[in-house]
């Protein structure tokens, strides 16, 4: 077949050495398969303008979610056209919307987990984002601490009060 050159720009937060390093690693890896990626560091205010206007090929961003996770804000179709909204890529998917709506009404942890797994599978198949990595987090615990509960998302944050046993 005919070889068609592929080139795109990756915008990274210019003050972040981490994002610049990750961008350059991807650039080198993509070059090995004939893809040209231009890493463009940009200051935060300019980066946000590009994101809000959806003027980018690819961009590095970090999502930090608190418990419980709110899938609607980032993934629901109703959020896709909101100016300066969190559904940055304009993702729309009727099945995703149904799962999100079911999650908002479900309180059983086991059922919520299954719905979240269905949702994650759908994101994997649709690929509106490519998730590169999650930072490692260290968490400590001592038996003297009572009422300690670690959540799956951001286990280092515990909104429940704990106390020393005695």
Where are the language model's segments positioned?
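Detector for C-terminal structural segments
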Residues: 14, 18-28, 48-166
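Short helix-initiation/N-cap motifs at beta->coil->alpha
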Residues: 39-49
């Amino acid at each position: 077949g005919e070889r068609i050159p592929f080139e795109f720009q990756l915008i990274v937060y210019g003050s972040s050495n981490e994002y610049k390093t990750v961008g350059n690693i991807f650039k080198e890896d993509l070059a090995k398969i004939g893809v040209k990626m231009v890493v463009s560091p940009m200051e935060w205010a300019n980066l946000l303008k590009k994101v809000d206007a959806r003027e980018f090929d690819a961009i590095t961003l970090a999502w930090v979610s608190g418990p419980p996770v709110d899938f609607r804000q980032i993934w629901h179709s109703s959020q896709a056209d909101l100016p300066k909204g969190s559904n940055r890529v304009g993702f729309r998917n009727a099945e995703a919307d149904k799962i999100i709506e079911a999650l908002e009404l479900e309180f059983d942890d086991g059922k919520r987990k299954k719905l979240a797994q269905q949702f994650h599978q759908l994101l994997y198949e649709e690929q509106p984002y490519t998730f590169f990595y999650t930072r490692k987090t260290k968490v400590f615990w001592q038996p003297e601490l009572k009422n300690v509960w670690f959540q799956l998302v951001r286990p280092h944050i515990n909104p429940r009060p704990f106390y020393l046993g005695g």
